[in-house]
Every structure is written in structure tokens, then in C-alpha cells.
């Protein structure tokens, strides 16, 4: 008898787990899609210069990280909306995006990755980079971006920046 009860309990537990998996997967897919939509909306607002929409899509405690040559005024970490908008002003004074193309994007839960190609023109030197690859890792919570971790060919950008 004891063995039958264990088997019955195991079967019930397995059935419960099996039935719960699609619901969890669907929830994860819904969260992933919502995160991807938020990041794409933020990216679109940024590309269109829509600061109001950007601000609405940013968490108050958002962190923006750019790695690279510390001589470039837009390399570093900024925390909070005010600091990020200040950074974006500095960036736009120094850089014009000559080409932008998202090639791949995917999300897993609250994390989004975007990969693409871009080309920049540096306003101080007038130099242009060759087209290069970028990558973005972003995190979303409650419909707002909380992390924007940017990766690009910083060598090419630094070379163009330092051209006189």
C-alpha cells in the first residue's frame, strides 16, 4: 500500500509539474516580449530625439554603461535619469550617427540583447569610423529600462576621435 501511495503522489506531482511548465513558459515568453518591446521603444525614442518618451521608459535608478577609451567624454557609467540625459547631451555634441542597423535582437525574461552595425562621425575631428559592430545588453523592470550596457568597437571610435 505504501508503495502505491508513493507512486500516486509521484504521478500527481509529475502531472502538476508538466501542466505548470507551459504556463511558466508562456509567462516567460510574455515577459521576454514585453522587455524586448520596451527596449525597442526606448531605442526608437532615442533615435528620434523624443526625450519625453525616453524619460517615461527609464527607471529613475537606471544605469547606463559605456566601456572604452577614458579620454572619450561619453565613456563611463551614469546613474539616474538626470545623469543619463547629461551624458546624452555630451554624446550628441561629439558624435553623429551616420549609419545604424539593428541586425538581431532577442530577450530572455527581463534581459534583452541587440546586435547590429553602425558608423559614426566625430564632430570635433570630422573623422568617420568605418562601419562596425555594436552589442547592447539591457534589463527591464516594470516596463522601464534599468540597465543599458553598451559595447562597440571602441578602438575605431577612439581613433576617429583623436584624429586631428
Describe every region a protein language model picked out.
Residues 58, 118-120, 152:
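Short beta-strand segments enriched in hydrophobic/aromatic residues
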Amino acid at each position: 500500500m505504501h508503495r502505491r501511495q508513493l507512486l500516486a503522489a509521484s504521478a500527481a506531482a509529475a502531472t502538476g509539474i508538466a501542466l505548470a511548465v507551459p504556463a511558466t513558459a508562456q509567462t516567460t515568453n510574455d515577459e521576454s516580449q514585453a522587455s524586448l518591446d520596451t527596449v525597442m521603444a526606448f531605442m526608437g525614442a532615442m533615435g528620434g530625439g523624443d526625450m519625453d518618451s525616453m524619460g517615461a521608459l527609464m527607471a529613475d535608478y537606471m544605469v547606463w554603461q559605456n566601456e572604452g577609451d577614458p579620454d572619450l567624454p561619453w565613456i563611463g557609467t551614469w546613474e539616474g535619469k538626470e545623469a543619463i540625459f547629461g551624458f546624452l547631451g555630451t554624446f550628441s555634441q561629439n558624435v553623429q550617427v551616420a549609419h545604424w542597423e539593428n541586425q538581431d535582437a532577442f530577450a530572455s525574461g527581463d534581459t534583452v540583447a541587440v546586435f547590429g552595425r553602425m558608423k559614426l562621425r566625430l564632430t570635433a575631428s570630422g573623422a568617420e569610423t568605418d562601419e562596425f559592430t555594436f552589442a547592447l545588453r539591457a534589463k527591464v523592470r516594470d516596463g522601464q529600462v534599468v540597465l543599458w550596457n553598451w559595447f562597440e568597437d571602441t578602438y575605431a571610435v577612439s581613433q576617429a576621435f583623436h584624429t586631428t
